[in-house]
Amino acid sequence: MMNESLTEKRNELSLSFAALGVVFGDIGTSPLYAFGQVIKYFPINDHNIYGILSLIFWSLIIIVSIKYLVIVFRADNDGEGGIIALAGVIRQKIKQPGGWLLFITLVGIGLIIGDGMLTPAISILSAVEGLESLSPNLAKYVLPVTLIILFFLFKMQSIGTGKIGVYFAPVMLVWFITIGILGFLQIIQNPKVLMAINPYYAINFFMIHKYLALFILGGVFLVMTGGEALFADLGHFGKKAIRTGWFAVALPALLLCYFGQGALVLMHTEDIKYPFFSLSPDWFLPVMIILATLATIIASQAIISAAFSILKQASLLNLIPRLKIVFTSKFEKGEVYLPLINFILALGTCSLVVIFKSSSNLADAYGIAVNLDMLITTVLVGIIAYRCWSWHAFKILIFLLILIIELAFFAGNIPKLLTGGWIPILIAFLGFVVMYTWHCGFEKLRELHHRDALMDAFIIDELNQNKISRQPGMGLYIIDPYDCEGESLLHHLRLNRIFFENMVFVSIKIENKPYIPIEDKFELIKKAEGFYLIFIHYGFTENINLPNELDEMFKRVYLPFDVIKNKLIYFIEIVFVEMTGERQKHMYLWQKHFFSLMIRNAVPDIQFYQLPYNNTIAIGTYYQF
């Protein structure tokens, strides 16, 4: 019993250590730019610095430690976190939640795409800016070096991070220890800054500066960027490991670093351009720049991988067009590479660096995207707390208090819309337009298939009455998600009068859960004599490999005929959309053309389901929009 307990603790510590290299990269590198961004708004004096440090301290405690690690962690979807997981929880409890949930989910995914561009840009740029602290003459190399690092960062995505990923956690542990020590060395020279832990200084700051204090909130919010990753990566590491890593390593190191920067600027009230790098002694500065660059590369890798993961899930749920998915590891099923998304993120990130030129300028664009993402999480978890947990009024009031605090941060970020904050909003809007257009087109296809279902119902009767001649063999028909029970393929059979002796229609169902246990994965329905419909249920985080699933299915699902696996013929549908000039419900003409373009360029079923090329027949179907 004792050995089992020791083993469990070791596993937990091992997971906590691994989480340092993935979960805390983004929030862990915020000290590079966050404090310097905050102090530029007001004169440096005791009251202002104490007020700022108090706001930083209580923001990390209330929003990250309490909201995320205590409340939001309760809203996991079978151990999985993130916006799609939250939406899945709501769909499980509220059968028809309405269009509002789709809207919030699509906006959230759009913001994540923007985050995937902004995080690498501001993180790596802020690290390379340390060259200016080394020598002002090196300032001209900041942009070229940043762009070179970003080029290789996105270039390496296609080969995966399996071999070098083992070094992420050790590097981040060294990073946290280093920034904690550097901050502590400044605090012991000016320990009075620890008084800022008292919330009085945060309240007093607002009483002195009144509405002007809202401007500071936009900067203070930067210390929490990356906080949403704690929940998004829940499925990889678990609650205990993330909580241990946060409270034992990340949070203490961050607080020491921020308070150390506060102590430093109070002792040196002259203009300090980069307070973070000023913490380091001159002899250690080159090492610090290298370490900061490595840490920001790791943080950027984490957000890129998260973007790949969330968009893969969105693709499975048909929220976006099907994407080419490359699995970069034989051992880690979650390691995926999306070539198109990688290109978009790389282009967007490098463009942001060239346009804004400094981390200080980029900070205005960065905070508002993460702020909106956190607000969406708060709203969704609030709905779950009310509808699923049956929280009473007092607990709901606590959650409303958190929402009010986050809305105050959002108010502080609104002035940044004019200085770059509009960029993540634009990215999210463009992403929303793509996803909503795809959704509308998909629903139109469902409507057309429902109409065909009424036309083809007579086929079932004829099959049951043996009025249709059949040829020997077996046909395996893969049904698209918009085709509930294979109406389009039945329509093809009706026109061509080609009926196999045994026909199996396979429908893929993506559920609102991350994983589906093997015993619940398959569902068999006999539609007619020799005609079967099989549903294969997947979770939204699972990888689809249809031939492998069919092997497992034939072992578990009884069929009254023999299946010769190497002679299986797969039938799939290729959709062609023909436009009409009419505006239809929820779709403008430009949306119909855009949907037609997307469906033509989406990854075909044969690749998406990983079907064998030599044993697959594609059937083209035209639909008039």
Curated annotation (Swiss-Prot):
<dbReference type="InterPro" id="IPR053951">
    <property type="entry name" value="K_trans_N"/>
</dbReference>
<keyword id="KW-0472">Membrane</keyword>
<feature type="transmembrane region" description="Helical">
    <location>
        <begin position="336"/>
        <end position="356"/>
    </location>
</feature>
<feature type="transmembrane region" description="Helical">
    <location>
        <begin position="394"/>
        <end position="414"/>
    </location>
</feature>
<feature type="transmembrane region" description="Helical">
    <location>
        <begin position="365"/>
        <end position="385"/>
    </location>
</feature>
<dbReference type="GO" id="GO:0015079">
    <property type="term" value="F:potassium ion transmembrane transporter activity"/>
</dbReference>
<keyword id="KW-0406">Ion transport</keyword>
<feature type="transmembrane region" description="Helical">
    <location>
        <begin position="417"/>
        <end position="437"/>
    </location>
</feature>
<feature type="transmembrane region" description="Helical">
    <location>
        <begin position="134"/>
        <end position="154"/>
    </location>
</feature>
<keyword id="KW-0630">Potassium</keyword>
<keyword id="KW-0997">Cell inner membrane</keyword>
<feature type="transmembrane region" description="Helical">
    <location>
        <begin position="284"/>
        <end position="304"/>
    </location>
</feature>
<feature type="transmembrane region" description="Helical">
    <location>
        <begin position="52"/>
        <end position="72"/>
    </location>
</feature>
<dbReference type="InterPro" id="IPR003855">
    <property type="entry name" value="K+_transporter"/>
</dbReference>
<dbReference type="InterPro" id="IPR053952">
    <property type="entry name" value="K_trans_C"/>
</dbReference>
<dbReference type="GO" id="GO:0015293">
    <property type="term" value="F:symporter activity"/>
</dbReference>
<feature type="transmembrane region" description="Helical">
    <location>
        <begin position="246"/>
        <end position="266"/>
    </location>
</feature>
<keyword id="KW-1003">Cell membrane</keyword>
<dbReference type="Pfam" id="PF22776">
    <property type="entry name" value="K_trans_C"/>
</dbReference>
<keyword id="KW-0633">Potassium transport</keyword>
<keyword id="KW-0769">Symport</keyword>
<feature type="transmembrane region" description="Helical">
    <location>
        <begin position="15"/>
        <end position="35"/>
    </location>
</feature>
<feature type="transmembrane region" description="Helical">
    <location>
        <begin position="164"/>
        <end position="184"/>
    </location>
</feature>
<feature type="transmembrane region" description="Helical">
    <location>
        <begin position="98"/>
        <end position="118"/>
    </location>
</feature>
<feature type="transmembrane region" description="Helical">
    <location>
        <begin position="212"/>
        <end position="232"/>
    </location>
</feature>
<dbReference type="InterPro" id="IPR023051">
    <property type="entry name" value="Kup"/>
</dbReference>
<comment type="similarity">
    <text>Belongs to the HAK/KUP transporter (TC 2.A.72) family.</text>
</comment>
<dbReference type="Pfam" id="PF02705">
    <property type="entry name" value="K_trans"/>
</dbReference>
<comment type="function">
    <text>Transport of potassium into the cell. Likely operates as a K(+):H(+) symporter.</text>
</comment>
<dbReference type="GO" id="GO:0005886">
    <property type="term" value="C:plasma membrane"/>
</dbReference>
<keyword id="KW-0813">Transport</keyword>
<keyword id="KW-1133">Transmembrane helix</keyword>
<protein>
    <recommendedName>
        <fullName>Probable potassium transport system protein Kup 2</fullName>
    </recommendedName>
</protein>
<keyword id="KW-0812">Transmembrane</keyword>
